[in-house]
């Protein structure tokens, strides 16, 4: 799936940067364009991979480039007033080659979440492609303003997009009481980008050897995400045994004899174990698995390890766990891969625990003000 990425606010811009970095390490490309917008000049200047002419500073007449200090209403108003400026990076971009837009934003501040909703609404008005959000929950789980902003921005983003990928930052932090360094944020953003990148890159091929037996094309992802709501991503990656690096092995590959002998029981066990790790391990947004309305299983690795029977069996297992019959599967052959990865996308989830906790913090703050 080819995507055009927008980063709204500091967190959104950093996630897009990590997606671009992930793409640089992969073949083929899956990002057709990237842009960022913010009310804080320093955060835009800190970006390295998003082109300078695709970065938009807005709200400067009110903030002098210093941001809105968590005031989501002012952030939303500024984005609405200058929406044309925010969309300028799409004017000369290859939008026709894009399957979808992806708008990334942190939800707890005054710029990212409100701006992402404005961007999503305007993109939907101008273009036919679906618009997906990436909503990053704040680590400040006990801060009333952050909780209120997160709930408000999440509701708006869900209503203005075709689906929102959630990422609960606090759930990935070992000690919420300690300040998080920029390096730690980069690590978290890289993990989110790896999961999103694995999903988007799955159907993008450059050679006939990269075509899977069951291709994960853009329509498969779109169908999994249709109907709106929140989505979560599970992931597992484990190294594969090294290829034959002997002289004979290298010569065989040079003449096109690249067949790899793999024990089918071994491949089945690997896929089964990793699928369970992906579903039962740390999701980008924790939820009751049974609340998912749709799912997609993507297996990436060297072709010989992509056991179709194992993939189908584990698709059935996910159907049992979710209670949904709308679970798809696909393989993503990568002849040079040194690992086997399993990605599980669950759409239409209900993260009740997180939303209830956020609402309690927001309500407590309102009671205190009264």
Swiss-Prot record:
Signal peptide segment: none
Domain of life: Archaea
Keywords: Cell shape, Cytoplasm, GTP-binding, Nucleotide-binding
CDD domains per the UniProt record, alphabetical: CetZ_tubulin-like
Gene Ontology CC annotation, any one: cytoplasm
Stored SMART domains: Tubulin
Gene Ontology MF terms: GTP binding; GTPase activity
GO BP annotation list: cell division; regulation of cell shape
SUPFAM superfamilies in the record: Tubulin nucleotide-binding domain-like
Statement: the UniProt record of this protein carries the keyword Zinc-finger: no
Sites where the protein binds GTP: 110-112, 189
Record's subcellular location: Cytoplasm
Consequence of gene disruption: Does not affect motility. No differences in growth rate or cell size.
Role played: Involved in cell shape control.
HAMAP family linked: CetZ
Family under the similarity heading: Belongs to the CetZ family.
Name under which the protein is recorded: Tubulin-like protein CetZ6
Gene responsible for this protein: cetZ6
